[in-house]
Amino acid sequence: MPAVEIINLTKDYEVGFWRKRKVRALDDLSLSIDEGQIFGFLGANGAGKTTTLKLLMRLIFPTGGSARILGHDIQDVRMHRRIGYLPENPYFYDYLTARELVEYCAELFGLTPVERRKRAADLLARVKLDEKRWDTQLRKFSKGMLQRVGLAQSLVNDPEIVFLDEPMSGLDPVGRREVRDLIASLRDEGKTVFMCSHILSDIEVLCDRVAILKSGRLAQAGYLDELRARPDDPHQMEVMATGVDAATLKQVLTNGQITPTPRGLRIEISAENEIEGVLAALRKTGGKVVSVQPIKQSLEELFMDQ
């Protein structure tokens, strides 16, 4: 059973005052997300990512189509007890402390006072919020600190699936690494994570599958390795070598493009069956092989090509 199943989901907005017109924010989107995966949802500003999340959370309502989460139609309010959600720009009560906010969210899910206190302490520690700030009012928090509190509240009900809209927003490099580790640990626990992010390097490190949205329509979806394969030549390989200079290697190498780099020579070949010729040339010239791997386009290249 898919963790999330989206079928022909469409959302139109009316804009204008005197002369109203419809703008299609999401156009016939269909997706299926397996349980236990980290799924990356990408797109430029205005592509429809946040609209999709708001539709799944029932904060807004679709013009057409349907969706199911954990086997239940999104109209089934009981489903919300099993999910966690961090919006892109969360707003919290300024005069609550971090501890009070998380305990309040736990109370909404029916936890006892003892359970609420323990859950709040466990989660604030898990998101690595400095314990000295647990009883500080949220109005005194930085953007990154508020983001950590938002992550804590999204996990208060021990959800089976977590929806995160720009979870790295406002975090410094150390904070991003800690949140990446947290998200990876959720997958290790068997949870499903649906995350939107503009930070492509984080998506590349974390996600099992991705989808790219363009102007409200699905442009690409699939496993990262499959999407990053070069469409013009999916069998291209890269050999990194040291211990030999480019001029010497060119005298004996009959195929392959040689490029000097700080790490050594980068040799590109267009087919796997050409590797033996490269290895033979390196042995003949005294070179050493550092690595052999397929050449894949980066996620940034894939994103920009859409």
State what each model feature region is.
Residues R180-I269:
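ABC transporter nucleotide-binding domain
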Residues S270-Q306:
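C-terminal coupling/interaction segments
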Residues V15, E35, A241-G243, A271:
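Non-catalytic surface loops within mature trypsin-like serine protease
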Residues D73-I74, L218, T242-V244, E272, ...:
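Short, surface-exposed acidic/glycine-rich loop or hinge patches that mediate macromolecular interfaces
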Residues Y95, V239, E268, V292-Q293:
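Active-site-adjacent beta-strand anchor residues
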Residues P2-V4, K11-K214, Q220:
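ABC transporter nucleotide-binding domains
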Residues R177, G256-T259, K288-Q293:
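A short linear hydrophobic-aromatic micro-motif
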